[in-house]
């Protein structure tokens, strides 16, 4: 009776007017009739905004009991389960929280990739572009990236400052970095990004007894070795690291439902 499904498009109550018939969700009446519970976790689903998503889902799934929570709580449940810990999202963006095994007890605001999001793919991309164009990264890396991406300097500036979804473009550079970690400069860049994440976020949490950090996201899983090395530097242990929360959530709800 429990269906957990990742939508192919992002549904964010802050940035979208909710109309699930607008192409994001395709359903058949016979399937709708079988759904009795929906657990939805999404970015922007705070206590103030989650009613928008809940109302939209209830409209199209009238027989279902609907629970809407933040993507951060979903991540915490996926990687920590019922154990206390520090749970993180390290993907295109970054977020973190102190989790007591049931709920989020503290959250350092991530502030987005312009003001914050240390540890994220978008910030890693910013650091990389700064490095290749200002000269702190080698000319070899610069030439290799420009060939890999097929982009010129003006095109990159256009993507960052004029085109939509600049954060996704920046985060996409992580793929190049992952493929070229043989360059010590790039590994150092990844570690520096994680160090900033720890210094600006993890070390700010008030619990000295919780020293285990678990993470969800493509950046966390792609650079797990660097994340573990950074955590060890700050005297933290890394628990679970997964690319996407769905498997962890299935395990979580298998025990609760």
Language-model segments: residues:
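ATP-binding/phosphotransfer module of carbohydrate and carboxylate kinases, centering on a glycine-rich
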Residues: 1-38, 52-56, 60-61, 79-86, ...
